Amino acid sequence: MDLHMMNCELLATCSALGYLEGDTYHKEPDCLESVKDLIRYLRHEDETRDVRQQLGAAQILQSDLLPILTQHHQDKPLFDAVIRLMVNLTQPALLCFGNLPKEPSFRHHFLQVLTYLQAYKEAFASEKAFGVLSETLYELLQLGWEERQEEDNLLIERILLLVRNILHVPADLDQEKKIDDDASAHDQLLWAIHLSGLDDLLLFLASSSAEEQWSLHVLEIVSLMFRDQNPEQLAGVGQGRLAQERSADFAELEVLRQREMAEKKTRALQRGNRHSRFGGSYIVQGLKSIGERDLIFHKGLHNLRNYSSDLGKQPKKVPKRRQAARELSIQRRSALNVRLFLRDFCSEFLENCYNRLMGSVKDHLLREKAQQHDETYYMWALAFFMAFNRAASFRPGLVSETLSVRTFHFIEQNLTNYYEMMLTDRKEAASWARRMHLALKAYQELLATVNEMDISPDEAVRESSRIIKNNIFYVMEYRELFLALFRKFDERCQPRSFLRDLVETTHLFLKMLERFCRSRGNLVVQNKQKKRRKKKKKVLDQAIVSGNVPSSPEEVEAVWPALAEQLQCCAQNSELSMDSVVPFDAASEVPVEEQRAEAMVRIQDCLLAGQAPQALTLLRSAREVWPEGDVFGSQDISPEEEIQLLKQILSAPLPRQQGPEERGAEEEEEEEEEEEEELQVVQVSEKEFNFLDYLKRFACSTVVRAYVLLLRSYQQNSAHTNHCIVKMLHRLAHDLKMEALLFQLSVFCLFNRLLSDPAAGAYKELVTFAKYILGKFFALAAVNQKAFVELLFWKNTAVVREMTEGYGSLDDRSSSRRAPTWSPEEEAHLRELYLANKDVEGQDVVEAILAHLNTVPRTRKQIIHHLVQMGLADSVKDFQRKGTHIVLWTGDQELELQRLFEEFRDSDDVLGHIMKNITAKRSRARIVDKLLALGLVAERRELYKKRQKKLASSILPNGAESLKDFCQEDLEEEENLPEEDSEEEEEGGSEAEQVQGSLVLSNENLGQSLHQEGFSIPLLWLQNCLIRAADDREEDGCSQAVPLVPLTEENEEAMENEQFQQLLRKLGVRPPASGQETFWRIPAKLSPTQLRRAAASLSQPEEEQKLQPELQPKVPGEQGSDEEHCKEHRAQALRALLLAHKKKAGLASPEEEDAVGKEPLKAAPKKRQLLDSDEEQEEDEGRNRAPELGAPGIQKKKRYQIEDDEDD
């Protein structure tokens, strides 16, 4: 981008900064405002970073900002603004674009910005610029905390950020082309920092306890200073060349010389004796060309050994998603003076700053005061400075802050987190892999430092090492870490350097663990196992489980005399304490008003257990809590009537509520059913550690393949890396006797390349191991000819054992675990039992066989497989467990079902009697479906259990029958809560019908109380929603869950009211699913008819309260007649409204229309008079509400009449 392509305003702003004349910079009067304008322009740049690119192309930093910084730093406002602008201009390109762009156009902009940043870095490599920065920073640090202002802290932070940004710019290797020991741009920058004295200020900030707020900034700058350095090489600078280094260099030169000599010898052998034009062509017998003919070779015979069918072919392009990860970290040797400066800086940092700074940074990380991923700088510093300390002069006290079990735990925790995130966040897998590599390097250095402590002459240091190793080897997670990293190694995300460090760290860990086991004799370690245990449970009635089962009438009569005597004594005691007995559960989710039925059951349980005083006390307490309806007796009840009431409670067949585990079970699944639950239990135990058993965990193909992958680059690997590879493979092949794990064709190709390498003499250890494996293979191939085929596959331990010990050896070893064979007598008995039980309906054939099989114990699976082997069954699928498939109905069974239906169709519980008397036991849902299919019933509601009418008792107004009906009603209200959408349609349909069956009776008191609390408008809104949903479902023909969205504040408050939510549940409205939904929903299983009935049940006497003064007569005799007259009108109106909804749903019969159609007309005139006398506002409101209900013209009158009825 050229200067003349700049934006006009941007160009004018840059020109207004000033100009450079010689070495002097002359600033313009409005220089400060121009700098602020540039900051504003950068704040509003587009996604291509156009402003940044134009300023970079104009070299604004080199030509204007740096001269202003160095020559006009006394102008504090201008200096602050220039620092702000520089921090913005030098921020990393990745930070500007968010990530590395993939589109070519944005990638071009990214590279252009990076080029300008590299130019900025070169411009900053001057002592003068860093001298001004260090001088300003020094003056600011001289101020005490009470003198330092907020602007001073901001300037300190901006200077540190500017240094960080400049050091962060990556080097341009293609342009610099610097060799080792030559000064690169980064080296020049470090030398400028050293000459300006900024390094001393960094050491001061790191060591001062008063400057802890800059800890992370300092650590980030230090990590960028040593980015390309090797700590071990840096520690040996200035001490002369060690003998070990000289020998390593000599070995490397010897390898290069041998390869060069081999190439010369090969070229000499390739020269033919004859002239090339008389070479001729050759036919290679036994090697076919593309056709069926022999191959024709047109080159000299000395080139025949290099022939390949792939010659001349284009190599197959590897897809981008399958390419191996590239190495990003590059290590190089800086100039000698820079390395000496860095070595001294490291020494001072370790002695004065390391422990304090690392402790402060760790505190920031644990308290979450740092930014995201700042722990990577902590792990880099740990690995680098501990390695430097170990290589320079090992002093454990200098790194004591990070030399503890807690540090091991912190690194292991982050390493595991990065490993899991790399597997889940596939888009950022490469970034997570780099962080995981840093954590692995830190873990490796921790182990190396502990290993170095073992050979320390100080006894206290060796004891500390022993304690750390004891803790590390004891915990299972530390031992399993390397196995997990090997098994999930992915070369597409993790570079080869990660695999190298993983192999070296594993080698060090195994060496330390093996040595520790030998010195201890026996080592006890922690062991964690996830065990699955199966728990069987039966869906039983709670009363049967508790043992309090209501007895037969004869047994009740036998028990009653003893209870009556106790009750006579207790009833006379009017001072019987009721304080200690609470008839309801205050912690239950069920409201207190709905716990009356449960209180009745508790009274019966006390009587069955012989606890008469407790039963009487509970009865009196319940009377105090629930006085309405005189269910537990009236307030002035006599002792004799109390005893008779308790006798009725004892003999009443009270329905019992299911336990909390079975409360959500459907009514169709009331039959007993065994369910198996698999529970994972993590058991922590201790066991004696066996090193060979632990080593066997590495004997798998995934680990071996990772080692072989690294071995392929043996020429580029260091001698230590190759030693680590060979040592692990030798452990598997020799110590575990599993050399067959390496019997693989790609491994043998690698061995062939190694043995034919001219410099094979430098890899004596690798050559020896390759010859050992090849010798083992050929020895096995002489016995097992199939070993050549096995070369094509990677193998596990089971295949290895079969290869070496013979195929089928695993079956012989596991013969003791096999089930015993079947004798002819057992087979005959099995055949007999199967034929006897296979046609029995409602019975599991295999379970019946297991119950009558008196031979050797067998499992269900063994019996099923043997039945299939004997030909008695076609497949294992024929023996599914009970309830997994539908048994077909036979003709006789259908006739029996029709006969039972005709016999019990007039009873109160048709379905219950059929289920008790039918021969072939089936579930309730199957019987209902069959009755519908046969046409015996038209709808499911015809099979519902009919409510029994309350009969007056001769003793009390509420007798035993009323008690039974009352309890049954409350239990149905509690059990008929709407279930989730995932239930079956047949279950949801029957439950919805049960809800509608008790809507009017259960909602009467609840709706009245809601009206009294001021929820009239939300109730009308809910009524309209139900009717609209019913209309939509009739028009569309399909139904789906409809959310109830409260748009007004009143409706929203009502939806949060517990009593209003209770009404919604009773109407069948489903609450929002946890974490997935927000609003209540009208379920899809409710039909339009059911929705209209629910809407009709919501009408309450809202207007009747205003009309009540006009309806109250002055004469008592007239009052009774008017009340009877009003009740008659209300009943007639209710029947008319229900008929209107039935007609709309198509359910009304002509007889009903004739019977009901005449009666509302008689009641209409009087109601019309009442309505006409109402206020005009209420009349208009009624007219507006009538169309919403979708009724005929008299809908308004009907609703008022229904509200009057429910008010009574």
Curated annotation (Swiss-Prot):
The modification Phosphoserine is found at residues 281, 1074, 1087, 1149, 1173. Residues 1000-1098 are annotated as: Interaction with PARP1. Its main location: nucleus. Residues 655-679, 971-994, 1091-1131, 1143-1208 are annotated as: Disordered. Changing residue 429 to D: In a breast cancer sample; somatic mutation. Expressed in all tissues examined including brain, heart, lung, liver, skeletal muscle, kidney, placenta, pancreas, spleen, thymus and testis. Highest levels of expression in placenta, pancreas, thymus and testis. Keywords: Biological rhythms, Cell cycle, Cell division, Chromosome, Developmental protein, Disease variant, DNA damage, DNA repair, Mitosis, Nucleus, Phosphoprotein, Transcription, Transcription regulation. Residues 664-679, 971-990, 1172-1181 have a biased composition (Acidic residues). GO terms for molecular function: DNA binding; enzyme activator activity; identical protein binding. Residues 816-954 are annotated as: DNA-binding domain. Monomer. Homodimer or homomultimer. Component of the circadian core oscillator, which includes the CRY proteins, CLOCK or NPAS2, ARTNL/BMAL1 or ARTNL2/BMAL2, CSKN1D and/or CSNK1E, TIMELESS, and the PER proteins. Interacts with PER2. The interaction with PER2 is direct and via its second PAS domain. Interacts directly with PER1 and PER3. Interacts with CRY2, CHEK1, ATR and ATRIP. Interacts with CRY1. Interacts with CLSPN; the interaction is required for leading-strand replication. Interacts (via N-terminus) with TIPIN. This is Protein timeless homolog.
